[in-house]
UniProtKB/Swiss-Prot annotation:
This is Putative manganese efflux pump MntP. Its main location: membrane. Belongs to the MntP (TC 9.B.29) family. Probably functions as a manganese efflux pump. GO terms for cellular component: plasma membrane. It is found in: Cell inner membrane. GO terms for molecular function: manganese ion transmembrane transporter activity. The chain crosses the membrane at residues 3-23, 37-57, 65-85, 112-132, 137-157, 170-190. It is a multi-pass membrane protein. It comes from Xylella fastidiosa (strain Temecula1 / ATCC 700964). The keyword Transport applies. Keywords: Cell inner membrane, Cell membrane, Ion transport, Manganese, Membrane, Transmembrane, Transmembrane helix, Transport. InterPro entries: Mntp/YtaF (IPR003810), Put_MntP (IPR022929).
Length: 194
């Protein structure tokens, strides 16, 4: 596989994470670079690991996973999106910063990890498909992880601008973005099979 093809795969696999990061940045309100790096590391590590896991699973049972991966991504992203919307509606009078500060640190980590996992299901599917090609999965996974890391930093910081415009409703916007990403994954799969 050529370096250009590998880079294009990395960019394509990181677009869902980029969209989710915009929502996360909006929910944080005024994220600092440190916040963006924290989110980017979690997304980057998970996005690096999932193609490797997919590749390993592809060695064993590729068609079983490919039949339902889109439903897993849709369910996780949709559920997280609904959760964010409900929280945004409950905390109507609070600022985004207040909301971010009151969340438990472990809860934030788990939410980030679940979001990263949901957006990386497609990378796992890529890993499965690459199990049948003569490629070095470590290089492809590293490129996907680095692209995701970079795009998530930009996404979180772009979410800062979005958060300024939407104010207290930023968490709702983030939830809507996650639902759109999950629905897009499901739609793309169903439209390709129908």
């Amino acid at each position: 596989m050529s370096p250009i093809t590998t880079l294009l795969i990395g960019i394509a696999m990181s677009t869902d994470a980029f969209a989710a990061a915009i929502g996360k940045g909006a929910a944080i309100g005024k994220p600092r670079l440190r916040d963006a790096l924290y989110v980017a590391v979690i997304f980057g590590v998970i996005e690096t690991a999932t193609p490797i896991a997919g590749w390993l699973l592809g060695q064993v049972a590729s068609h079983y996973i490919a039949t339902f991966d889109h439903w897993i991504a849709f369910g996780l992203l949709g559920g997280l999106g609904i959760h964010m919307i409900v929280n945004g509606l409950k905390n109507n009078g609070n600022t985004c910063k207040d909301n971010a500060d009151t969340h438990n640190r472990n809860s934030r980590w788990l939410t980030l990890a679940a979001t990263a996992l949901a957006t990386s299901i497609d990378a796992a599917a890529i890993g499965i498909s690459m199990a049948f090609l003569d490629i070095h999965i470590g290089i492809v996974a590293a490129v996907i992880g680095l692209c995701t890391f970079t795009m998530v930093i930009f996404g979180v910081m772009l979410g800062r601008v979005l958060g300024t415009f939407v104010g207290n409703r930023a968490e709702i916007v983030g939830g809507i973005i996650l639902i759109i990403v999950g629905s897009t994954i499901l739609y793309e799969h169903l439209s390709n099979t129908g």
